Design a protein with these regions (language model features):
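Compositionally biased terminal segments of proteins
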Residues: 1-155
Length: 155
């Protein structure tokens, strides 16, 4: 399975707009991009390790998406989380996706894939294990199960 084309377009535009703040595709779409899982996703997660990065880029990302023909609504303002999280609802026609801009730790530099920077496979898996333990949604268990048995990318 490939990343949904609408979500991929949203991710590409947002990653370019936020590029100088270290954002990379994360969450389920990162695992899909690495070929570890096959499932539909409901959101696009972009993570940066830089303090305040979501707050610093949210307006720029909104403008870039609007210029690319998307309708953009602010779902959660970065001010609600000291600049560490922002959520946008992005739509065009009948297609809609939540775009999450968040600060998150990473150990490895992102992988450069066709879509743009994507969390290193080890960091993508680690983030999903953390999500599985922390929130325990079915999709987190599906994602972690999809990574079982894969060779470690680093030692």
């Amino acid at each position: 399975m490939r990343i949904d084309s609408f979500q991929a377009e949203v991710a590409r535009v947002a990653l370019v707009a936020a590029g100088d703040h270290g954002f990379a595709l994360a969450g389920g779409n990162a695992l899909i991009a690495h070929g570890l899982v096959e499932r539909p996703t409901q959101d696009v997660d972009l993570f940066s390790p830089q303090a305040g990065a979501p707050g610093a880029v949210s307006h720029r990302v909104r403008r870039a998406l609007a210029s690319a023909g998307f309708r953009v609504e602010v779902t959660r303002r970065p001010e609600e989380s000291a600049g560490e999280f922002a959520q946008l609802t992005v739509s065009r026609g009948e297609a809609m996706v939540l775009l999450d801009l968040a600060r998150d730790w990473r150990e490895q530099p992102p992988a450069g894939l066709d879509i743009g920077p994507v969390l290193h496979i080890d960091d993508a898996v680690g983030s999903k294990v953390t999500a599985m333990v922390g929130r325990g949604l079915p999709r987190d268990f599906i994602d972690v199960a999809g990574t079982l048995g894969r060779p470690a990318a680093s030692s």
